[in-house]
């Protein structure tokens, strides 16, 4: 099935098109054109601007719903409400918590994927629990500890492979080995909530870490004399 959307303006990756029509073919966006075939079905959004949906890769809750509720209702509520903000995909993000609680969140998320009526769940993000206390922010230090591969495997099994991002502090013991194993499983490793030195941070990067969390906020600040995580 093919139909067309008319709009005031269309935003593409490297250009903007004024007016015209965007084809939708079997549920997927197609080509833009100035005109449409005679008799074509057209949805009129001429007072609106059309742009790609946003992807929120770090979100703990929205519209009164919280990932730590550990409920399908909350995840689906976030999914529907996020459309109002232009978000079409997201990573529900869990905070530092006990191992079993995080495992339960993995199971709930895995069971919810595919039931969304709004923004799609693209995977799960664990912000913790492998942080350190100095720059803990809102994270609960009681449940912080050194990274353990066996925990990751248990979480990943419960999540049916949906745990795709995890943030940790690079000064934790055993970080390099953990990062190497996690990245083999397709998990993106982020660095944050950390009091690490530059050398500790770079060792984590060399092991495979590739993303930062709360840079210039949840980490020790740098000076003209010493580079740090930031």
Predicted features and spans:
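Histidine-rich, glycine-flanked metal-binding segment
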Residues: 1-51
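Divalent metal-coordination and catalytic microenvironments
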Residues: 8, 22, 27, 47, ...
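Divalent metal-dependent hydrolysis catalytic cores, especially in the metallo-beta-lactamase
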Residues: 60, 76-105, 119-132, 159-171, ...
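Active-site mouth loops of central-metabolism enzymes
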Residues: 61-73, 138-145, 188-192
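Charged helix-capping and loop-helix junction motifs
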Residues: 71-74, 105-108, 148-149, 225-230
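Conserved phosphate-binding/catalytic loop of the ribokinase/pfkB sugar-kinase fold
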Residues: 132-157
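Active-site core of metal-dependent hydrolases
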Residues: 157-230
């Amino acid at each position: 099935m093919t139909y067309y959307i008319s709009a005031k303006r269309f935003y593409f990756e490297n250009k903007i098109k004024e007016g015209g029509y965007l084809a939708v073919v079997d549920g997927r966006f197609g080509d833009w054109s100035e005109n449409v075939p005679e008799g074509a079905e057209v949805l009129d959004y001429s007072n609106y601007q059309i742009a790609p949906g946003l992807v929120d890769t770090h979100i703990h809750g929205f519209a009164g719903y919280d990932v730590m509720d550990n409920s399908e209702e909350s995840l689906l509520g976030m999914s529907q409400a996020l459309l109002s903000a232009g978000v079409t995909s997201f990573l529900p993000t869990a905070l530092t918590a006990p191992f079993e609680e995080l495992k339960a969140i993995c199971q709930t998320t895995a069971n919810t994927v595919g039931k969304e009526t709004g923004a799609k769940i693209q995977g799960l993000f664990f912000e913790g629990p492998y942080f350190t206390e100095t720059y803990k922010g809102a994270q609960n230090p009681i449940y912080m500890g050194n990274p353990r591969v066996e925990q990751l495997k248990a979480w990943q099994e419960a999540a049916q492979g949906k745990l795709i991002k995890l943030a940790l502090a690079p000064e934790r013991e055993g970080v390099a080995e953990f990062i190497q194993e996690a990245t083999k499983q397709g998990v993106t490793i982020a660095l944050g909530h950390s009091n690490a030195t530059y050398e500790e941070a770079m060792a984590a990067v060399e092991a495979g870490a590739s993303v930062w969390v709360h840079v210039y906020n949840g980490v020790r600040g740098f000076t003209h004399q010493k580079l740090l995580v930031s």
